[in-house]
């Protein structure tokens, strides 16, 4: 007899005997309380009959509970003995040969597929996060760190403006209560300017910021690149512009010396020196006399040194003449010889 047929016959014999034993056990368990009730009914002793019936029912229930609990404990103890990484593919675990063969073939195939799928064929780019370097186009330079959260960066920029008054990390803004990001951008880069490029970029910057912050959708990589590019543009504008320059269209034509500025800084810096009108046309290559400087040193001899220029106008006419027709203009970078000849030191004891 082949081994396979013997295994089949042995399996069927085991199952048949097991089924017969279970049937007899269930039958006797059912007959026992019924027989006890019948025997007690025929007896004349009521107390004994009650004890027999109740005892039979309690014994049946107790035996059933013991069998069920014992079965559960036995199964769990058997499961604990099996290692967690153990695969039931042996003949004892899975007697069917075809099933074992199919499992082994699929396991080998899954191993090959895991190697193929380890690196995706197409770049996987999730909105809101900077993809890793392997997903970038090798022809372009890596712009941001891997897995950078775009929304967190933009939120950090707005939080610094809201709580610290710092705009684009280089400008301290005295914000008023109720001002928003759009109000700050408009006040700084849209008003008092006629630069069309700057105005258009300001509007794009505001629209892009509001779309990113309040659209409810994840920030795409292109949106974040555009936002960073505009932020860098406005940083350069804020670093290179002159806040003291007059605003176009706001000049006060009624006066040639007073300008109407928003911040009022130049109004306080107007020189009070009384130069003639033609003196401004000479440029900055000429030296105008300054006030006399005194150098005083106190010691045992009480020596006082006074530093005076070699030529000092004695009256307003000579001062005006020197300003209009200077004889020896002084350069901004005088030589050592010129410096030595330009000053005299008079010592008084």
UniProtKB/Swiss-Prot annotation:
Gene Ontology cellular-component annotations: membrane
Extracellular domain ranges by topology: 40-49
Keyword Iron recorded: no
Localization annotation: Membrane
Top-rank taxon, per record: Eukaryota
Keyword terms of this UniProt record: Membrane, Transmembrane, Transmembrane helix
Ranges where the record places region Disordered: 312-333
Topological category with respect to the lipid bilayer: Multi-pass membrane protein
InterPro entries reported for this sequence: DLT1 (IPR038869)
Annotated TM spans: 19-39, 50-70
Cytoplasmic side: 1-18, 71-349
Function: Required for growth under high-pressure and low-temperature conditions.
Protein family membership: Belongs to the DLT1 family.
Name by which UniProt lists this protein: Defect at low temperature protein 1
